[in-house]
């Protein structure tokens, strides 16, 4: 059996769906009409009274002048999808500001599009406490973005929460860490967001159909289907999954800023010249080990050379497989990914850099240097990429003194991360500095809060062996560039 009022509930739901987006005041009774389209059971005066704000005299605007009155219910005019105006159409906006996914940050109530904050909180989204019990260090730590920058350099930190710089009143800088800047979407000519042909989200324009460009400034004269067809590569992928399709043309992801066209090219980005480069080729403009021609990612070798990358001379008495095996040593890569293998012998790169050496280039003394270029913190010597510390010092880079001049309490206070946990629970504290667990080689950072597995790899090596992983980002050594320090921008070597 259906519960009492079920039919009336269906009538109400049908009425609301028919009317569009609307709101129902608490005084509304679902039995005011017997069925949709039936005569109203209220008098005209009573219907209009219910559509006026309390205390307003007869003759005052119904539904605040923003809707029509239908049997005591305001049917509000919908100006934009997602914008509502309340039971009596009294609100200009219905949706309130959010912070970290919560309306009014969970510290207030939404009233007509504006947050009414609980006592002890303030801000557009009630996100700022009036009294702060955090230390400045903890507060700043909570305000750092994934690049370890406080409020993305676009705001100030207030008790662990970012207050974005919107002094011009535009409100275009926002986000938990002020990481979004919608000023980037303003078209220079029209001064409109996305040229008036799209929506901006976190500094990026999302264009309406038929428009494209960084700021939706260009109009496309072909259909989306035709655009997709022109961008489809021979293997059936859009721009070979290595580019972006814009109005039927592929813009390939250029990974080599020094190249004339980059390593990826072709009408549908089907050619990847990186497949022609040996590890050591990145030190020069050579493809195919300097002994062949690269044609759309495949090497055509000169006479006297063979191999996938023309790396093996036919004059060598070893087979290509034997040559590579001799050059690998204990590494999975020939010459440890740091040199050129030719007939079973390694030539370490960059040439002339004495910090890279060994039979299979297994020693890399650059690993003993910190980001400032200091070897073993100035308290040790480097031996095959590892620090041998002087007496009284220890650590991967000899950065920790064995003697400490502070109390245990002082030391622990300096080792607490933003959440109050000592070294993020992944290390021990010594003299105010965290020593991350040796068992988990990938844990690093001031508070052991970073995971070096997040750093990009190339040729199977983190940061390609040409930089240091710092909190998930590669810090490249001089002469190197790229997300994984895979691009050589230094001098060309013979």
From Swiss-Prot:
Swiss-Prot/TrEMBL IX repeat ranges: 415-454
III repeat start-end pairs: 143-184
Tissue: Widely expressed in many tissues, but readily detectable only in aorta.
Residue positions the entry lists as glycosylated: 405
SUPFAM superfamilies listed in its UniProt record: EGF/Laminin (SSF57196)
Disulfide bonds, paired cysteine numbers: 40-71, 51-69, 63-74, 76-89, 91-112, 96-110, 104-115, 117-126, 132-159, 143-157, 151-162, 164-178, 180-202, 185-200, 194-205, 207-216, 220-247, 231-245, 239-250, 252-269, 271-296, 276-294, 288-299, 301-310, 316-343, 327-341, 335-346, 348-361, 363-384, 368-382, 376-387, 389-398, 404-431, 415-429, 423-434, 436-448, 450-471, 455-469, 463-474, 476-485
Name of this chain's protein: Integrin beta-like protein 1
Organism lineage: Eukaryota, Metazoa, Chordata, Craniata, Vertebrata
Every I-EGF domain range: 40-90, 91-127, 132-179, 180-217, 220-270, 271-311, 316-362, 363-399, 404-449, 450-486
């Amino acid at each position: 059996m259906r519960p009492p009022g079920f039919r009336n509930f269906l009538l109400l739901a049908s009425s609301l769906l028919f009317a569009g987006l609307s709101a129902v005041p608490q005084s509304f009774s679902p039995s005011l009409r017997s069925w949709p389209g039936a005569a109203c059971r209220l008098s005209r005066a009573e219907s209009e009274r219910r559509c006026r704000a309390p205390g307003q005299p007869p003759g005052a605007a119904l539904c605040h002048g923003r809707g029509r009155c239908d049997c005591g219910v305001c049917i509000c005019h919908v100006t934009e999808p997602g914008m509502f105006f309340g039971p009596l159409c009294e609100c200009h906006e219905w949706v309130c500001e959010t912070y970290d996914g919560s309306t009014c940050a969970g510290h207030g109530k939404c009233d007509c599009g504006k947050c009414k904050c609980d006592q002890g909180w303030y801000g557009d989204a009630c996100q700022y406490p009036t009294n702060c019990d955090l230390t400045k260090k903890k507060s700043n730590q909570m305000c750092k973005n994934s690049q370890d920058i406080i409020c993305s350099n676009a705001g100030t930190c207030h008790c662990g929460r970012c207050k974005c710089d919107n002094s011009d009143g535009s409100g275009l800088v926002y986000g938990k860490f002020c990481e979004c800047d919608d000023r980037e979407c303003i078209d220079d000519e029209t001064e409109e967001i996305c040229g008036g042909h799209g929506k901006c989200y976190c500094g990026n324009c999302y264009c309406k159909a038929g428009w494209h460009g960084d700021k939706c400034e260009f109009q496309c004269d072909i259909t989306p289907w035709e655009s997709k067809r022109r961008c489809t590569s021979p293997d059936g992928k859009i721009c070979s999954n290595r580019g972006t399709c814009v109005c039927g043309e592929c813009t390939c992801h250029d990974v080599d800023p020094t190249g004339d066209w980059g390593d990826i090219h072709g009408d549908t980005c089907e050619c990847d010249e990186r497949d022609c480069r040996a590890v050591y080729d990145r030190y020069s403009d050579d493809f195919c080990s300097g002994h062949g021609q690269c044609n759309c990612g495949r090497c055509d070798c000169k006479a006297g050379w063979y191999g996938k990358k023309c790396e093996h001379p036919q004059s060598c008495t070893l087979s290509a497989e034997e040559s590579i095996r001799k050059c690998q040593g204990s590494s999975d890569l020939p010459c440890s990914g740091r040199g050129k293998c030719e007939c079973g012998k390694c030539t370490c790169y960059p040439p002339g850099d004495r910090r890279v050496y060994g039979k299979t280039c297994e020693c890399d003394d650059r690993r003993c240097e910190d980001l400032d270029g200091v070897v073993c913190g100035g308290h040790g010597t480097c031996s095959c990429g590892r620090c041998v510390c002087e007496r009284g010092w220890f650590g991967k880079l000899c950065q920790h003194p064995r003697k400490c001049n502070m109390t245990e309490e002082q030391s622990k206070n300096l080792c607490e991360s933003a959440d109050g946990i000592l070294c993020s629970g992944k290390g021990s504290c010594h003299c105010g500095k965290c020593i991350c667990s040796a068992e988990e080689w990938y844990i690093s950072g001031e508070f052991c809060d970073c995971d070096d597995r997040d750093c990009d790899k190339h040729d199977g090596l983190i940061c390609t062996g040409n930089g240091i992983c710092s909190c998930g980002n590669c810090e490249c050594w001089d002469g190197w560039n790229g997300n994984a320090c895979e691009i050589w921008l230094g001098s060309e070597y013979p």
